[in-house]
Amino acid sequence: MTLVDSITVSEAGGLTFLDIENDLASAKISLFGGHVLSYIPKSDNQERLWLSPHAYLNGERPIRGGIPVCWPWFGEDPSNLGRQAHGFARNLLWNVLDCQLHDDIAEITLGLESTATSKQWWPSEFRLRKKIVIGDQLDISLTTENRGEIPFSISKALHTYFLVGEISQTTVVGLDGVDYLDKTLDFSKHTQVGDITPFAETDRVYLESPAHVQIIDQSLSRKIDIEQSGADNIVVWNPWTRASLLNDMDADDYGHFICVETANALANSVIIAPGASHQMQVKYNVSSTASSP
Protein backbone atom coordinates (compact mmCIF):
# COMPACT_ATOMS: atom_id res chain seq x y z
CA MET A 1 0.00 0.00 0.00
CA THR A 2 1.26 3.49 -0.88
CA LEU A 3 0.47 6.31 1.56
CA VAL A 4 1.86 9.08 -0.63
CA ASP A 5 4.41 9.08 -3.44
CA SER A 6 7.68 7.59 -2.11
CA ILE A 7 6.14 6.12 1.08
CA THR A 8 4.85 2.55 1.06
CA VAL A 9 3.69 0.13 3.74
CA SER A 10 5.15 -3.36 4.15
CA GLU A 11 4.74 -6.16 6.68
CA ALA A 12 7.12 -8.81 8.00
CA GLY A 13 7.35 -10.86 11.17
CA GLY A 14 4.00 -9.52 12.31
CA LEU A 15 5.26 -5.93 12.23
CA THR A 16 4.32 -3.04 9.96
CA PHE A 17 6.96 -0.86 8.34
CA LEU A 18 7.06 2.36 6.35
CA ASP A 19 9.49 2.25 3.43
CA ILE A 20 10.63 5.64 2.15
CA GLU A 21 12.31 6.08 -1.21
CA ASN A 22 12.71 9.58 -2.63
CA ASP A 23 15.29 11.38 -4.74
CA LEU A 24 17.31 12.36 -1.68
CA ALA A 25 17.30 9.30 0.57
CA SER A 26 15.78 5.98 1.50
CA ALA A 27 14.69 4.97 4.99
CA LYS A 28 12.76 2.34 6.90
CA ILE A 29 10.56 2.91 9.96
CA SER A 30 8.93 0.32 12.21
CA LEU A 31 5.56 1.32 13.64
CA PHE A 32 6.42 -0.92 16.58
CA GLY A 33 8.32 1.51 18.75
CA GLY A 34 7.99 4.36 16.23
CA HIS A 35 11.49 3.27 15.39
CA VAL A 36 13.73 4.50 12.54
CA LEU A 37 15.69 1.43 11.39
CA SER A 38 17.59 2.71 8.38
CA TYR A 39 18.60 5.98 6.73
CA ILE A 40 20.59 6.02 3.47
CA PRO A 41 21.18 9.36 1.70
CA LYS A 42 21.41 9.16 -2.09
CA SER A 43 24.53 11.35 -2.01
CA ASP A 44 26.63 8.23 -1.42
CA ASN A 45 24.09 5.41 -0.85
CA GLN A 46 25.76 4.53 2.45
CA GLU A 47 23.84 3.42 5.55
CA ARG A 48 24.08 5.81 8.51
CA LEU A 49 22.45 3.69 11.23
CA TRP A 50 23.56 0.43 12.81
CA LEU A 51 20.96 -2.32 13.25
CA SER A 52 21.88 -5.51 15.07
CA PRO A 53 21.78 -8.64 12.89
CA HIS A 54 20.03 -10.25 15.86
CA ALA A 55 17.50 -7.49 16.49
CA TYR A 56 14.03 -8.73 17.44
CA LEU A 57 11.85 -7.66 14.52
CA ASN A 58 8.75 -9.49 15.72
CA GLY A 59 7.41 -7.27 18.49
CA GLU A 60 8.60 -9.55 21.30
CA ARG A 61 11.29 -7.16 22.52
CA PRO A 62 12.56 -3.64 21.80
CA ILE A 63 14.55 -3.38 18.58
CA ARG A 64 18.33 -3.22 19.00
CA GLY A 65 19.82 -0.53 16.77
CA GLY A 66 18.49 2.29 14.64
CA ILE A 67 16.90 5.08 16.70
CA PRO A 68 14.93 3.76 19.69
CA VAL A 69 12.68 6.18 21.60
CA CYS A 70 13.34 6.12 25.36
CA TRP A 71 10.23 7.65 26.98
CA PRO A 72 8.74 8.62 29.49
CA TRP A 73 11.86 7.70 31.41
CA PHE A 74 15.46 7.19 30.40
CA GLY A 75 17.51 4.43 32.01
CA GLU A 76 16.32 2.39 34.94
CA ASP A 77 12.82 2.78 36.39
CA PRO A 78 13.04 6.04 38.41
CA SER A 79 10.34 4.85 40.81
CA ASN A 80 11.97 1.46 41.47
CA LEU A 81 8.71 -0.33 40.67
CA GLY A 82 10.32 -2.98 38.51
CA ARG A 83 9.23 -1.39 35.24
CA GLN A 84 11.42 -1.95 32.19
CA ALA A 85 14.36 0.32 31.48
CA HIS A 86 13.92 3.22 29.04
CA GLY A 87 10.13 3.38 29.35
CA PHE A 88 7.43 1.84 27.20
CA ALA A 89 7.25 3.95 24.01
CA ARG A 90 9.67 1.60 22.24
CA ASN A 91 7.39 -1.36 23.02
CA LEU A 92 4.10 0.00 21.69
CA LEU A 93 2.55 0.28 18.24
CA TRP A 94 2.58 3.88 17.02
CA ASN A 95 -0.07 5.36 14.75
CA VAL A 96 0.61 7.10 11.45
CA LEU A 97 -0.90 10.58 11.81
CA ASP A 98 0.37 12.28 8.67
CA CYS A 99 2.56 11.68 5.61
CA GLN A 100 3.60 14.43 3.22
CA LEU A 101 6.09 14.98 0.43
CA HIS A 102 7.56 18.44 -0.21
CA ASP A 103 10.35 19.01 -2.73
CA ASP A 104 11.37 15.34 -2.52
CA ILE A 105 11.54 15.54 1.29
CA ALA A 106 9.31 13.05 3.13
CA GLU A 107 7.63 14.19 6.36
CA ILE A 108 6.07 11.50 8.53
CA THR A 109 4.31 12.10 11.84
CA LEU A 110 3.71 9.21 14.22
CA GLY A 111 1.80 9.32 17.48
CA LEU A 112 1.02 7.65 20.79
CA GLU A 113 -1.67 8.54 23.30
CA SER A 114 -2.41 7.38 26.81
CA THR A 115 -4.50 4.22 26.94
CA ALA A 116 -5.48 1.61 29.48
CA THR A 117 -2.35 -0.28 28.45
CA SER A 118 -0.01 2.67 28.97
CA LYS A 119 -1.59 3.40 32.35
CA GLN A 120 -0.50 -0.02 33.56
CA TRP A 121 3.02 1.44 33.53
CA TRP A 122 2.43 5.18 33.90
CA PRO A 123 -0.84 6.84 35.01
CA SER A 124 -0.48 10.17 33.20
CA GLU A 125 -2.66 11.46 30.35
CA PHE A 126 -0.42 12.31 27.42
CA ARG A 127 -0.09 12.78 23.70
CA LEU A 128 3.28 11.98 22.10
CA ARG A 129 4.20 13.02 18.57
CA LYS A 130 7.28 12.07 16.58
CA LYS A 131 7.96 13.90 13.33
CA ILE A 132 10.55 12.36 11.01
CA VAL A 133 11.85 14.39 8.06
CA ILE A 134 13.79 12.38 5.49
CA GLY A 135 15.86 14.19 2.89
CA ASP A 136 19.56 14.90 2.44
CA GLN A 137 19.63 15.06 6.23
CA LEU A 138 17.53 13.30 8.87
CA ASP A 139 15.49 15.47 11.26
CA ILE A 140 13.50 14.10 14.19
CA SER A 141 11.36 15.94 16.72
CA LEU A 142 9.64 14.42 19.74
CA THR A 143 6.80 16.43 21.29
CA THR A 144 5.15 15.51 24.59
CA GLU A 145 1.81 17.08 25.55
CA ASN A 146 0.26 16.87 29.00
CA ARG A 147 -3.45 16.19 28.50
CA GLY A 148 -4.18 15.62 32.17
CA GLU A 149 -4.98 17.88 35.10
CA ILE A 150 -1.73 17.58 37.06
CA PRO A 151 1.90 18.19 36.06
CA PHE A 152 4.08 15.22 35.19
CA SER A 153 7.81 14.69 34.88
CA ILE A 154 9.52 12.86 32.02
CA SER A 155 13.03 11.97 30.97
CA LYS A 156 13.67 10.86 27.41
CA ALA A 157 16.22 10.15 24.70
CA LEU A 158 16.63 9.37 21.04
CA HIS A 159 19.05 6.46 21.53
CA THR A 160 20.69 6.67 18.10
CA TYR A 161 23.07 3.90 17.00
CA PHE A 162 25.43 5.32 14.37
CA LEU A 163 27.17 2.89 12.04
CA VAL A 164 30.95 3.34 12.09
CA GLY A 165 33.73 1.51 10.30
CA GLU A 166 35.79 0.81 13.42
CA ILE A 167 35.17 2.13 16.93
CA SER A 168 38.90 2.59 17.60
CA GLN A 169 39.02 5.07 14.70
CA THR A 170 35.92 6.97 15.82
CA THR A 171 36.00 10.25 17.75
CA VAL A 172 33.24 12.38 19.28
CA VAL A 173 34.14 16.07 19.05
CA GLY A 174 32.57 19.02 20.86
CA LEU A 175 32.34 17.89 24.49
CA ASP A 176 35.76 19.06 25.71
CA GLY A 177 35.36 20.72 29.12
CA VAL A 178 31.82 19.41 29.65
CA ASP A 179 31.02 17.64 32.93
CA TYR A 180 29.57 14.14 32.76
CA LEU A 181 28.28 11.38 34.99
CA ASP A 182 29.98 8.04 34.35
CA LYS A 183 27.67 5.06 34.85
CA THR A 184 30.61 2.65 34.71
CA LEU A 185 32.01 4.42 37.80
CA ASP A 186 28.82 4.56 39.89
CA PHE A 187 27.67 7.79 38.24
CA SER A 188 30.65 9.72 39.60
CA LYS A 189 31.14 13.18 38.10
CA HIS A 190 34.06 13.99 35.80
CA THR A 191 35.06 16.63 33.27
CA GLN A 192 35.76 15.68 29.66
CA VAL A 193 39.32 16.44 28.57
CA GLY A 194 39.73 16.60 24.80
CA ASP A 195 37.73 14.53 22.34
CA ILE A 196 36.22 11.11 23.02
CA THR A 197 37.71 7.99 21.45
CA PRO A 198 36.19 4.95 23.18
CA PHE A 199 38.72 2.31 24.22
CA ALA A 200 36.58 0.51 26.81
CA GLU A 201 32.96 0.36 27.91
CA THR A 202 31.58 3.90 27.71
CA ASP A 203 28.33 5.02 29.35
CA ARG A 204 28.27 8.74 30.08
CA VAL A 205 25.59 11.38 30.54
CA TYR A 206 27.03 14.78 29.60
CA LEU A 207 25.57 17.71 31.53
CA GLU A 208 24.59 21.09 30.07
CA SER A 209 25.62 19.75 26.69
CA PRO A 210 26.27 21.95 23.66
CA ALA A 211 23.79 22.18 20.81
CA HIS A 212 26.29 20.78 18.31
CA VAL A 213 28.63 17.79 18.43
CA GLN A 214 30.31 15.80 15.71
CA ILE A 215 31.34 12.21 15.15
CA ILE A 216 34.52 11.76 13.11
CA ASP A 217 34.70 8.30 11.52
CA GLN A 218 38.18 7.94 10.04
CA SER A 219 37.59 4.38 8.88
CA LEU A 220 34.67 5.37 6.63
CA SER A 221 36.09 8.86 5.90
CA ARG A 222 32.99 10.69 7.04
CA LYS A 223 31.74 12.99 9.75
CA ILE A 224 28.30 13.15 11.33
CA ASP A 225 27.07 16.53 12.52
CA ILE A 226 24.48 16.43 15.31
CA GLU A 227 22.42 19.57 16.05
CA GLN A 228 19.97 19.36 18.93
CA SER A 229 17.51 21.61 20.73
CA GLY A 230 15.17 21.16 23.69
CA ALA A 231 17.70 18.72 25.18
CA ASP A 232 20.07 19.34 28.08
CA ASN A 233 22.10 16.16 27.77
CA ILE A 234 24.12 14.11 25.35
CA VAL A 235 24.64 10.45 26.20
CA VAL A 236 27.61 8.54 24.74
CA TRP A 237 27.37 4.76 24.95
CA ASN A 238 29.25 1.73 23.70
CA PRO A 239 29.11 -1.59 25.59
CA TRP A 240 32.56 -2.75 24.45
CA THR A 241 33.12 -6.36 25.51
CA ARG A 242 29.89 -6.33 27.53
CA ALA A 243 28.20 -6.77 24.14
CA SER A 244 28.76 -10.49 24.69
CA LEU A 245 26.23 -10.33 27.55
CA LEU A 246 23.46 -9.02 25.28
CA ASN A 247 21.47 -11.74 23.52
CA ASP A 248 20.54 -9.53 20.57
CA MET A 249 24.11 -8.55 19.71
CA ASP A 250 27.23 -10.42 18.61
CA ALA A 251 30.26 -10.19 20.90
CA ASP A 252 32.23 -8.09 18.40
CA ASP A 253 29.38 -5.81 17.28
CA TYR A 254 30.57 -3.05 19.61
CA GLY A 255 33.31 -2.29 17.09
CA HIS A 256 30.85 -1.06 14.48
CA PHE A 257 28.62 1.47 16.21
CA ILE A 258 28.57 4.32 18.65
CA CYS A 259 25.51 5.75 20.36
CA VAL A 260 25.41 9.53 20.69
CA GLU A 261 22.01 10.26 22.16
CA THR A 262 19.95 13.43 22.39
CA ALA A 263 18.42 13.38 25.85
CA ASN A 264 16.83 14.95 28.89
CA ALA A 265 18.03 12.53 31.54
CA LEU A 266 18.53 12.10 35.28
CA ALA A 267 18.35 15.52 37.01
CA ASN A 268 17.48 17.13 33.68
CA SER A 269 14.04 15.56 33.49
CA VAL A 270 11.30 17.89 32.23
CA ILE A 271 8.18 18.89 34.17
CA ILE A 272 5.21 19.55 31.88
CA ALA A 273 2.20 21.46 33.21
CA PRO A 274 -1.39 20.52 32.27
CA GLY A 275 -2.11 21.64 28.72
CA ALA A 276 1.56 22.39 28.03
CA SER A 277 4.02 20.56 25.81
CA HIS A 278 7.75 20.09 25.39
CA GLN A 279 9.66 19.42 22.18
CA MET A 280 13.08 17.85 21.72
CA GLN A 281 14.63 17.97 18.25
CA VAL A 282 17.75 16.67 16.54
CA LYS A 283 19.20 16.93 13.03
CA TYR A 284 21.77 14.53 11.57
CA ASN A 285 23.92 15.45 8.60
CA VAL A 286 26.76 13.33 7.21
CA SER A 287 29.56 14.51 4.95
CA SER A 288 32.86 13.16 3.69
CA THR A 289 36.21 13.81 5.38
CA ALA A 290 38.18 12.41 2.46
CA SER A 291 39.53 15.83 1.46
CA SER A 292 40.07 17.06 5.02
CA PRO A 293 43.68 17.73 6.08
Language model segments and positions:
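Beta-strand-rich N-terminal accessory domains
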Residues: 1-64, 211-212, 216-231, 274-292
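Short, hydrophobic/aromatic beta-strand segments
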Residues: 38-40, 150-156, 293
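Beta-strand-rich interaction surfaces with strong enrichment in secreted/lumenal proteins
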Residues: 58, 129-131, 268-272
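Acidic/His-leaning functional-site neighborhoods
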Residues: 92, 197-274
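Asparagine-centered strand-capping/turn motif at beta-strand->loop junctions
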Residues: 29, 142-148, 286
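Active-site/ligand-binding surface loops and adjacent short beta/alpha elements
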Residues: 150-153, 157, 161-233
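Extended, loop-rich substrate-binding clefts of extracytoplasmic carbohydrate-active enzymes
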Residues: 4, 83-134
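Hot-dog-fold acyl-thioester-processing enzymes
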Residues: 48-91, 225-248
